Amino acid sequence: LENKEHLKLIVEGCVRGERKSQEALFKQLYGKMLVVCYRYINDKDAAQDVLQDGFIKVFDKLGFFDFSGSFEGWVRRIIVNTAIDSIRKSNKNPFLSDQDTDFKQEAVDEMVEKEELEFKTLKAEVALEAISKLSPAYRTVFNLFVLEDFTHREIAEMLGINEGTSKSNLAKAKMNLQRILAEKFKYIES
């Protein structure tokens, strides 16, 4: 969004219910927020539905935005929460680990503290494709921790799980991503 004054005019127009302002805001953020939705929801149509629902929430809450922080970050948080709500509604316990966890807490902590995957060296689409292959539980925790910079405590509160489950899901997500990427690059080299 170009500058704070321009943004403020658009937001004020949206709060007044002006369609032109709502359309301008939607068009400016649509692409970025759709990418956010795709990180959580693998199905294209479902991701677009989540995005629509998220923007409805954004428009409903615009009057509460105080311009003290990043507007895009504020919108992103609403979209992420909408995606998480959608996943939660579609599965019984989607954020609990997919397998029984036999990890000892120290091992999980050690794995989490290891160096982050070097996604900067990968093309974005390769990384997103690999992330999309993770289970909903692993993908969601990975996205929230690595891409959205939430802490394990915040993730646990958002998803209704304990911190240990968040750490375990992140560790397993990283292991699965390493396996997925190794297989992909092994296939490419062959």
Residue positions per predicted region:
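Structural recognition of an alpha-helix C-terminal capping motif at a helix-to-coil junction
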Residues: 35, 49-56, 69-81
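Amphipathic, Lys/Arg- and hydrophobic-enriched alpha-helical face
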Residues: 26-44, 61, 131, 180-183
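A short pre-motif secondary-structure segment
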Residues: 141-145
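Arg/Lys-rich amphipathic alpha helix in sigma70-family domain 2
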Residues: 63-67, 77-98, 172
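Internal acidic/polar
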Residues: 4, 93-119, 151
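Short, Lys/Arg-enriched C-terminal cap helix and immediately downstream tail that follows
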Residues: 88, 134, 139, 171-190
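Sigma70-family region 2
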Residues: 15-16, 52-70, 89-91
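A short, charge-rich alpha-helical start-of-domain segment used by transcription regulators
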Residues: 11-35
